[in-house]
């Protein structure tokens, strides 16, 4: 595996740090960073402990899955149109009948479906980016990633700027026990290759990946961390799991280990007599997902494709993990006072089974509906009227909503894009939370039909059916930018690579009926929203994105 097994150039000192558990380094660096944070961070500077009591305050769980499509959670019956999906191209190893695919999706999430039925489904909910790093950064900050120069995973690879406040810090400063479990993907990282005899053709197995000290979760609002710092990790035997700053061994299947950790967080908060704020970021169903899930999950599925069965088994492992967490909350007396906010970090990739993103156009890494319109809900037993909420909302609203529920004020100088949804959900406010949502992102075909040949050959390589690692012509860095703006009626999409502008009704999930020519005034107004957004955002952090960003600005200038 020439590209995947290429060793990182790292210093001997980094290797020694890793081997020794990084203890001495971490202790010194942590003290230094914490001191700086208390002096510079808005969340710290505005906090006075005597102003707030945690008594009776709700527990918070922000729950994410990785690359789960809108159609892979039976979230919206409108996204399960067999006629729309039956002719969809898919990667060979995932080919199954559409009826079996829908059945598998329905069987994989009984617990999540129950929570949705008891809570509020955000049927017009979007994440702030089509790929993981920027999307997760937006959840943490309540701000569009462009505000701090992040337009792609490449921009995020040196860590989310330390000038940005992560909203969990506000919970921590107000007496909450805060924990992050699972995927982090918000740090500047280093990779240390594992011994060659331990390496495989799954690149997740081949490096120990760890965060630079400044970007450690414990320096961004969390009392406790257990998980991985990279974009993904192996489902078994991960070499990159950390508990706080110490590398720890993998124990069985990754979903089960993360669930065990989450239950530990719930129990510690109970012992400490503190409310908790848990960010629980499962790895599933992120690819590569070839290693078989445990039999207790596998036996639920019989689609005719072992690969598809395993995919949905990984989804089911998360669902059953959530079930275990709910049971522990009930046992501890925490169940009735816990809020759960759920989303996928972005849409599904073409390297997965139907229903993928359902009837929607697009995939991960794009701002078509399939890339950013994700299954999203809020559950707070007895506190919210169950049903669908169809106004435009964003995952950037998650932490502002949770902070509002906890009666924690947000410093005004944070300038958030996210808002608390509670006034609308509790019928205290009319109208809609957002007039518009805007995206400026890299636009790649990495995860759509155009790249099926790469994914077919990738599976052959991983399974030792070929010794040639396939060339990927559609990476993020090789792709141009696009912009998208949505209001509560329309979606306006422009892509630089084909100079295409489209205006579509939000109800046109396939974006087949381009209304731009017939609605020039709507187009003009929505382009004005994008210009204002750019003017209040930062240029890309990475050099590779500078020209692409300028191309977007040029296109908007020429459209005046």
Regions found by a protein language model. Name each.
Residues 1-26:
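Gram-negative bacterial Sec-dependent N-terminal signal peptides
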Residues 28-58, 65, 70, 87, ...:
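Long, internal low-complexity/basic segments
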Residues 35, 152-157, 161-169, 173-177, ...:
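Formylglycine-dependent
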Residues 35-37, 70-166, 170-180, 189-199, ...:
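Active-site segment of extracytoplasmic enzymes that catalyze sulfate/phosphate-ester chemistry
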Residues 56, 99-109, 126-131, 154-165, ...:
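A short beta-strand-to-alpha-helix junction
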Residues 56-61, 117-123, 172-179, 220-224, ...:
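Loop/turn elements at helix/coil->beta-strand transitions in domains of secreted/extracellular proteins
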Residues 200-211, 215-218, 223, 348-358, ...:
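C-terminal cap/loop subdomain of S1 sulfatases and analogous C-terminal strand-loop tails that border
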Residues 275, 281, 317-354:
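Metal-dependent active-site segment of extracytoplasmic phospho-/sulfohydrolases and closely related
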